[in-house]
């Protein structure tokens, strides 16, 4: 059991680092689990990869609790109004995922949750990040404050989030890319991605957990500990990564992540080719 818990810690670190950076946590977990794989059933592993996101979500809620809490003591009437408006934008941005991503999730997972499609998605969106950043160089963003983001923009960002239904896309990558295309600053894009992740990832993790049990699966005590340890690790690592990204985007663009995605995608393609041959 100790070895399984050590693996859970390692996978929790991978989740915490890659969930909020636009690099695809799914792609990383699949690559890492080729070498560091939990000795558990396939059904458990599929559920594990999603449910440990709860730790990452709780990190967002911890860091931004005062900003996201409309009942926070000391907030003015205007502050409370802005908080409710922010939540309204988040809810509106969730609508496309509810209407499109949820019904199609199982189909995309069955047909695209493999190394080659994930590698291609990594490369395609890596190129997109580099292209968008080069295109926007010298152009001032139109939206530099979340309070000034329109509901229409929030809805369109939600449409971009639907693209993350393709494994390897990266939920944060799709929403950040969409927000920048729609004229937001990098800071606004990152912040809204964090907030949008709360209901999206809570809902997705909840659906995966419910489906796991409805399919007749159960959890033994070892699996409970594995989920708990990985989620707590993802939470602690996410606290650091979220703060890093919010500071990073104030001085840098996302080009470096574009190159990283291309390199990782190429590595996955080479690895898939080698395993196919041998």
Swiss-Prot record:
Report keywords, A-Z.
Antibiotic resistance, Cell membrane, Cell shape, Cell wall biogenesis/degradation, Hydrolase, Membrane, Peptidoglycan synthesis, Transmembrane, Transmembrane helix
The catalytic activity, as recorded, is: di-trans,octa-cis-undecaprenyl diphosphate + H2O = di-trans,octa-cis-undecaprenyl phosphate + phosphate + H(+)
Any transmembrane segments, and where? 44-64, 84-104, 112-132, 187-207, 224-244, 254-274
Q: Which InterPro entries match?
A: UppP
Topology term for the membrane: Multi-pass membrane protein
User: Is rRNA processing given among the entry's keywords?
Assistant: no
Q: What is its main location?
A: membrane
Q: List the subcellular locations.
A: Cell membrane
Molecular function as annotated in GO: undecaprenyl-diphosphatase activity
Q: Which domain of life is it from?
A: Bacteria
Q: Name one GO biological process term.
A: cell wall organization
Q: What EC identifiers does the entry list?
A: 3.6.1.27
Entry keyword annotation includes Transmembrane helix? yes
| Main enzyme class | hydrolase
One cellular component term from this protein's GO annotations in UniProt: plasma membrane
- Please give the Pfam families that the UniProt record associates with this protein: BacA (PF02673)
Q: What else is known?
A: Bacitracin is thought to be involved in the inhibition of peptidoglycan synthesis by sequestering undecaprenyl diphosphate, thereby reducing the pool of lipid carrier available.
Q: Which HAMAP family match?
A: Undec_diphosphatase
* Known function: Catalyzes the dephosphorylation of undecaprenyl diphosphate (UPP). Confers resistance to bacitracin.
- List the NCBIfam families hit by this protein, alphabetically: PRK00281.1-4 (NF001390), PRK00281.1-5 (NF001391)
Family statement drawn from the similarity comment of this UniProt entry = Belongs to the UppP family.
Put simply, this protein is called Undecaprenyl-diphosphatase
Whose protein is this, by species?
Streptococcus suis (strain 05ZYH33)
Which classification does the entry list for the species?
Answer: Bacteria, Bacillati, Bacillota, Bacilli, Lactobacillales
Recorded name of the encoding gene: uppP
